[in-house]
């Protein structure tokens, strides 16, 4: 028997052997004689077969990999009997796989099964996840079941998306989105797109490699135009969004995100020769044109970035510069590259982060909303009689409140109300407001405290509010 700090095998029966790490049994998943998947301290791990070289290796790589910090497929060797005389060597691996719509389908199925078996409803399960940062015990088996089917996704990644599915505050970027007409693509839209592309390739008898080439080729415009029009009919996105997504996801360029010193030198030469013709530069450097553009703009063009603490003068200049831009371009998003030029050696990402940090401080420093204020805000939004949330005039609401709260503070508080009361799935924005108003008014009357009025009765008449 091997000592501690070793990955070892121990005889179990004549036909099988048990695998241990630091005297912790690796429990086999499925058929113990043929499986290459095990559970170690509650974590599913997988092994791939290689030639056996009779080398015993410390299991530290296994522990590191399970902790989520494995790099470049760190290797450990274990032993499992596959016959009476031959042994195999196994390599633990974890890919850094992007979260896909297929993973959402699997996770949502497992969540549905979990809720049925545990007899918890959605709200009760959400409350369990909110109470603690660690994974509650009832959810442990759910994560194990997911990783059995998708072993190359880390436990941490699954847990984050689990919290996102239940709309836990702070995990908004991991939330499940079925459909979205703008911004990040919804899971259902991506599944629809991938199915349609698979059918299209089969109909045209194109290989995967051919399809990648044709997406970026000028010689198959008619065929690709047919595909784009079909996707436009099926997916609630504009044609430009579909076109850009397809070219990002399906491209023949071999080089990805890593840049060497030689790659940067080559990019400088190409820009000197061809200017900002990023499509041409992308083809010549075998990279996505947008990757070339972004790397040039973010790392080469700015020169030496100023990373010192922001001075008071710089903060004031940043606020002034952004406000001037918004006044000149009220309907367009902020072009942070232009803001960065005015701030000299400040990176555009740093300018963006600092601006929103300063704005959020103004929001937090305003008077806190009380229950009566929340009801007042919902009623004012109902009075605006708009069909969608994006049509709300937050500046108008701020004026109604005599600027007690800024427009951004009103908007942020409304988002907080929706998350707190868990509003999802209502058909119209009007239904959402009515439902929120009803829920807020269900509280005891003595809690109806307001910054704007002495008591709730002071604004019970809607005609007297403005």
Swiss-Prot record:
Molecular function terms from GO: mating type region replication fork barrier binding
GO biological process, one term: negative regulation of DNA replication
InterPro entries in the record: DMTF1_DNA-bind_reg, Homeodomain-like_sf, Myb_dom, REB1_MybAD, SANT/Myb
Start and end residues of each stretch annotated as DNA-binding domain 1: 94-249
Region span, DNA-binding domain 2: 250-421
Effect of residue 154 to L: Abolishes wild-type barrier activity and induces a new barrier signal of inversed polarity
Assigned keywords, A-Z: DNA replication, DNA replication inhibitor, DNA-binding, Nucleus, Repeat
Feature: DNA-binding region: 278-300, 336-359
Transmembrane parts of this sequence: none
Main localization category: nucleus
HTH myb-type domain span: 251-304, 305-363
Gene Ontology cellular component annotations, sorted alphabetically: nucleus
Compartments in which it is found: Nucleus
Variant or mutagenesis effect after changing residue 136 to L: Abolishes wild-type barrier activity and induces a faint new barrier signal of inversed polarity
Entry-linked PANTHER family: CYCLIN-D-BINDING MYB-LIKE TRANSCRIPTION FACTOR 1 (PTHR46380), REPLICATION TERMINATION FACTOR 1 (PTHR46380:SF4)
Domain notes: DNA-binding domain 1 interacts with the repeated motifs encoded by the RTS1 element as well as the elements enhancer region. DNA-binding domain 2 has only a weak DNA binding activity.
Role this protein plays: Mediates site-specific replication termination at the polar replication barrier RTS1, a barrier which ensures that replication of the mat1 locus in S.pombe occurs in the centromere-proximal direction.
Protein name: Replication termination factor 1
Organism: Schizosaccharomyces pombe (strain 972 / ATCC 24843)
Organism ancestry: Eukaryota, Fungi, Dikarya, Ascomycota, Taphrinomycotina
């Amino acid at each position: 028997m091997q000592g501690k700090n070793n990955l070892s095998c121990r005889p179990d029966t004549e036909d099988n052997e048990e695998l241990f790490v630091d005297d912790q049994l690796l429990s086999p998943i499925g058929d113990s004689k043929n499986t290459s998947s095990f559970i170690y301290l509650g974590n599913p791990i997988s092994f791939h077969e290689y030639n056996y070289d009779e080398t015993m290796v410390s299991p530290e790589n296994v522990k590191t990999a399970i902790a989520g910090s494995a790099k470049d497929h760190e290797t450990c060797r274990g032993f499992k009997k596959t016959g009476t005389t031959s042994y195999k060597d196994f390599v633990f691996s974890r890919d850094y796989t992007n979260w896909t719509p297929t993973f959402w389908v699997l996770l949502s199925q497992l969540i549905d099964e979990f809720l049925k078996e545990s007899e918890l409803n959605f709200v009760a399960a959400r409350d369990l996840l909110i109470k603690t940062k660690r994974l509650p015990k009832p959810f442990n088996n759910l994560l194990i079941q997911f990783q059995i089917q998708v072993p190359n996704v880390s436990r941490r990644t699954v847990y984050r998306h689990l919290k996102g599915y239940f709309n836990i505050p702070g995990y908004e970027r991991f939330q499940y989105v079925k459909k979205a007409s703008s911004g990040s693509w919804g899971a259902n839209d991506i599944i629809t797109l991938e199915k349609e592309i698979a059918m299209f390739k089969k109909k045209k008898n194109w290989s995967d490699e051919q399809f990648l080439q044709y997406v970026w080729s000028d010689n198959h415009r008619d065929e690709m135009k047919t595909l784009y029009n079909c996707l436009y009919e099926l997916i609630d996105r504009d044609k430009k969004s579909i076109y850009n997504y397809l070219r990002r996801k399906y491209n023949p360029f071999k080089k990805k995100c890593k840049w060497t010193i030689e790659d940067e030198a080559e990019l400088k030469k190409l820009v000197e020769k061809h200017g900002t013709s990023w499509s041409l530069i992308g083809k010549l450097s075998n990279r996505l044109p947008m990757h070339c553009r972004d790397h040039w703009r973010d790392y080469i063009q700015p020169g030496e970035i100023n990373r010192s603490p922001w001075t008071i003068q710089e903060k004031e200049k940043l606020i002034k510069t952004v406000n001037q831009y918004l006044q000149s371009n009220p309907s367009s998003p902020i072009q942070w590259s232009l803001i960065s030029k005015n701030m000299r050696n400040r990176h555009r990402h740093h300018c963006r982060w600092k601006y929103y940090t300063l704005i959020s401080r103004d929001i937090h420093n305003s008077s806190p909303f009380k229950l009566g204020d929340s009801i007042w805000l919902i009623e004012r939004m109902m009075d605006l009689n708009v069909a969608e949330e994006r049509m709300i005039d937050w500046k108008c609401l701020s004026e109604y409140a005599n600027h007690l709260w800024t427009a951004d503070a009103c908007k942020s508080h409304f988002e907080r109300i929706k998350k707190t009361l868990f509003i999802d799935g209502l058909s119209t924005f009007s239904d959402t407001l009515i439902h929120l108003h009803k829920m807020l008014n269900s509280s005891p009357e003595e809690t109806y405290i307001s910054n704007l009025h002495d008591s709730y009765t002071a604004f019970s008449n809607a005609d007297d509010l403005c």
